A protein has these predicted regions:
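Terminal, regulation- and interaction-focused segments at domain boundaries
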Residues: 1-27, 126
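Well-ordered alpha/beta subsegment
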Residues: 104-129
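Short amphipathic alpha-helical/adjacent loop interface patches that line ligand
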Residues: 17, 59, 118-121
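Short secondary-structure transition/capping segments
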Residues: 24, 75-88, 125-129
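Short glycine-/small-residue-rich flexible loop motifs, especially phosphate/cofactor-binding loops
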Residues: 21, 38-39, 122
Length: 129
């Protein structure tokens, strides 16, 4: 499945966690939610899962623009960035395809915002070497 833009890095998980937050901030996104899947699965299900985080990222200017066009679009927010540690200790980083998600609205102005979001998320992810 292709839910968004993805890349792999050999950087350690904790380093990726730190760098992706900084990189998202540089392109105008703040982190408004965070889920530590490994911790949550251990606490709730007593399952040992690989290291995996979900960051809910929001660009306030683009969110404001989208909500002014269609208030219901808030159900599609925030933009999720996920990263997980693979068996070989590499880390995969993936950002939602906002254009694809917003194409369901059939509203050209929202689709354009999705394109802008994708460009910024790709820039943030590509900054992780």
């Amino acid at each position: 499945m292709n839910y968004g833009y993805q890349k792999k890095t050999t950087l350690p998980f904790d380093k990726v966690d730190n760098l992706i937050r900084k990189s998202l901030s540089k392109v105008g996104f703040g982190i408004i939610s965070e889920i530590d899947i490994q911790k949550t699965f251990k606490e709730k299900l007593d399952i040992n899962y690989n290291r995996y985080k979900v960051l809910g990222a929001c660009n306030p200017a683009l969110a404001n623009e989208a909500l002014n066009i269609e208030p219901e679009v808030g159900m599609l927010m925030p933009c999720n960035i996920v990263f997980w540690e693979n068996k070989d200790k590499s880390v995969t980083i993936s950002g939602i395809d906002a254009e694809k998600q917003l194409s369901n609205t059939n509203h050209n102005d929202l689709i354009k915002i999705g394109q802008d979001v994708n460009k910024l998320l790709k820039e943030a992810i590509d900054a992780i070497k």
